[in-house]
Amino acid sequence: MTDLKTTFAGLSLRNPIIISSSGLTNSAGKNKKLAEDGAGAIVLKSLFEEQIMLEADQLKDPAFYPEASDYLEEYIREHKLSEYLTLIKESKKVCPIPIIASINCYTDSEWIDFAKMIEEAGADALEINILALQSEVQYTYGSFEQRHIDILRHIKKTIKIPVIMKLGDNLT
């Protein structure tokens, strides 16, 4: 049989088939099956800061005390992060191939916090999925490209695992 071993972002892969972030990669059981079926690496379903905040906002009630809203927001954040970190740990236990976490954040502090926790949970690498809309008011030529570079630099200063940047079609 032909040897398909390769490397990607410093990771040794048995073949170049990398399962992308999707609903197919949102459970350790599914990831185990993908590994058994021959995948070379798996990118976990992305963790979106925006979805966490949206869920928290949906539970806010103007009749609540502000402290209650803050508590709910923090609880939901911690719960969602815990679920994601558990997915990493459980996938690592059952998969003999690299597990790549994926995050999408919109606040600078969360890029760093999420990256640290993901590395500590045992992910082999981190995909950063940056969405930048050029319809934003503060857009100037090159500003989104610079934002990508800045986020990457901050994350690379913080963690040791490989970082992969997912680029959208809105960059020049």
Model-derived segments and spans:
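Active-site entrance/lid segments in N-terminal catalytic domains of soluble metabolic enzymes
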Residues: T2-T172
